[in-house]
């Protein structure tokens, strides 16, 4: 029976960057790794309602820099930055070094696999029909420019006695093409019948040039709005 490799894991260093970017000696590596795990666990728990997509961690010169990618930056920052300051103090206490927290906004949450999976899971918990939730997510992603999307739900769908899996796909989702930019994530819906698992694959196009092209695209600022061409006036 064929099994699927994790789409991010197989593409690390090819078209996908690491979530933690730091170097440590042998004696510090385990402590840093545990610190990253605790920081992510704490932030995901504290910001459960803030639509957090991913958390990236850097460790420059005995400090920690955490970047929170979220679709709702206002909730993370809080009134006059109070909430983000509390988070900074808590992260600094967990990691044991001075902390800096950056907030990055996710411009199109419909094209983010984590946010799509969380959205479907929350709809299932609110007793929305699973087929309707899947179709709505797929249509939103395709409308906003995704090249392809696949959604799979597994469990006691609709309260059935026997658990099963159902999936829905539109467009292309090439899992074997290493240069394909595939965003993948999972979520769980805790219903009265039990847990329903949600998996989402989103194909955003192919990346030519490897990690250099990825780094260049991340460094580029957002495109400035283009000015309308001036009219020639009366002749």
From Swiss-Prot:
Keywords: Ribonucleoprotein, Ribosomal protein, RNA-binding, rRNA-binding. InterPro entries: KH_dom, KH_dom-like_a/b, KH_dom_type_2, KH_sf_prok-type, Ribosomal_S3_C_sf, Ribosomal_uS3_bac-typ, Ribosomal_uS3_C, Ribosomal_uS3_CS. GO terms for molecular function: mRNA binding; rRNA binding; structural constituent of ribosome. Pfam families: KH_2, Ribosomal_S3_C. Residues 215-235 are annotated as: Disordered. GO terms for biological process: translation. Transmembrane segments: none annotated. Residues 39-107 form the KH type-2 domain. One of its GO terms (cellular component) is cytosolic small ribosomal subunit. Belongs to the universal ribosomal protein uS3 family. Binds the lower part of the 30S subunit head. Binds mRNA in the 70S ribosome, positioning it for translation. Part of the 30S ribosomal subunit. Forms a tight complex with proteins S10 and S14. This is Small ribosomal subunit protein uS3. It comes from Haemophilus influenzae (strain PittEE).
């Amino acid at each position: 029976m064929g099994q699927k490799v994790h789409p991010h894991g197989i593409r690390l260093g090819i078209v996908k960057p690491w979530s933690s970017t730091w170097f440590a000696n042998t004696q510090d590596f385990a402590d840093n790794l545990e610190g990253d795990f605790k920081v992510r666990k704490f932030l995901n728990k504290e910001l459960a309602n803030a639509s957090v997509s991913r958390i990236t961690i850097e460790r420059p010169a005995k400090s920690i820099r955490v970047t929170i990618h979220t679709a709702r930056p206002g909730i993370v920052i809080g009134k006059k930055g109070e909430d983000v300051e509390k988070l900074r103090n808590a992260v600094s206490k967990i990691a044991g070094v001075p902390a800096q927290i950056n907030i990055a906004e996710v411009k199109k949450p419909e094209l983010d696999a984590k946010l799509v999976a969380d959205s479907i899971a929350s709809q299932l918990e609110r007793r929305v029909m699973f087929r309707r939730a899947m179709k709505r997510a797929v249509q939103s992603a395709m409308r906003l420019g995704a090249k392809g999307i696949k959604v799979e739900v597994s469990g006691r769908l609709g309260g059935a006695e026997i658990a099963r899996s159902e999936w829905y796909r539109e467009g292309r989702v090439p899992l074997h093409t290493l240069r394909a930019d595939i965003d993948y994530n999972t979520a769980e819906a805790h219903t009265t019948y039990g847990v329903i698992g949600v998996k989402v694959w989103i194909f955003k196009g192919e990346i030519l040039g490897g990690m250099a092209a990825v780094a260049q695209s991340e460094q580029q600022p957002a495109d400035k709005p283009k000015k309308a061409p001036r009219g020639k006036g009366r002749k």
